[in-house]
From Swiss-Prot:
Stated name of the protein: Small ribosomal subunit protein eS4A
Gene3D superfamilies for this protein: 2.30.30.30, 2.40.50.740, RNA-binding S4 domain
Major location (coarse): cytoplasm
Additional note from the record: Present with 573 molecules/cell in log phase SD medium. There are 2 genes for eS4 in yeast.
Cross-link (Glycyl lysine isopeptide (Lys-Gly) (interchain with G-Cter in ubiquitin)): 62, 134, 161, 168, 174, 179, 211, 233
Length: 261
């Protein structure tokens, strides 16, 4: 039986949304241990080399990172396999570019550029609200942050707006009907809509009914739902497509219209 941490990842076992081809090697970069799960993260090497095409190979990615040009959530990262994940802000000082990792409706991480102002904060979903030693209250967010002395009105499943420079909570959004949400898992991954209502299932998974801007309704599990703002007023800029999933026929019609057929 194997002992200790796994250090390799076969290419065919890598997450599909990394979009790695099957034939250019046996292995894929295995993400380091970090704030996001392996299957919900994107290593910096995949982002810089495969998405942005700023490097041709892993050696060049290492050279870029070692010049300390790349920051994730305001902190310099030099690990090529550092796992960036949903809502993380990646800043490239050399090119003055900022990106936020968000999903498109196909379930992949979109290359979504944002302004300097928007790059100063991120949103975090509250996973846990507890009392620590000596009765100090704290919350834990989806990206592993522990924030002490939060607003007492913050509950699990709410979303907090975190200032990246100080790490403090500047605002929060309650989980309620009518709020704008992003789906972060399941078959509706990447869709954006407003909460219609929540279904409780004791001993099972709570379900959330969501309606998108085209009035299509769909259902997903509560732990796949991430509140991003009020209806019509998201706290972050949305990626191309605005989180609206089209049917295959609608995609075909849109393609034909663009081609002038």
């Amino acid at each position: 039986m194997a002992r200790g941490p796994k250090k390799h990842l076969k290419r065919l076992a890598a997450p599909h949304h990394w979009l790695l081809d099957k034939l250019s090697g046996c292995y894929a970069p295995r993400p380091s241990a970090g704030p996001h799960k392996l299957r919900e993260s994107l290593p910096l090497i995949v982002f810089l080399r495969n998405r942005l095409k700023y490097a041709l190979n892993g050696r060049e990615v290492k050279a870029i990172l070692m010049q300390r040009h790349v920051k994730v959530d305001g902190k310099v990262r030099t690990d090529t396999t550092y796992p960036a994940g949903f809502m993380d802000v990646i800043t490239l000082d050399a090119t003055n570019e900022n990106f936020r990792l968000v999903y498109d409706v196909k379930g992949r991480f979109a290359v979504h550029r944002i302004t300097d102002e928007e790059a100063s904060y991120k949103l975090g979903k509250v996973k846990k609200v507890q009392l620590g030693k000596k009765g100090v209250p704290y919350v834990v967010t989806h990206d592993g942050r522990t924030i002490r002395y939060p607003d007492p009105n913050i509950k699990v499943n709410d979303t907090v707006k975190i200032d990246l420079a100080s790490g403090k909570i500047t605002d929060f959004i309650k989980f309620d009907a009518g709020k704008l949400v992003y789906v972060t898992g399941g078959r509706n991954l990447g869709r954006i809509g407003t909460i219609v209502h929540k279904e409780r299932h004791d001993g099972g998974f709570d379900l959330v009914h969501i309606k998108d801007s085209l009035d299509n309704t769909f259902v997903t599990r509560l732990n796949n739902v991430f509140v991003i703002g009020e209806q019509g007023k998201p706290y972050i800029s949305l990626p191309k497509g605005k989180g609206i999933k089209l049917s295959i026929a609608e995609e075909r019609d849109r393609r034909r219209a663009q081609q002038g057929l």
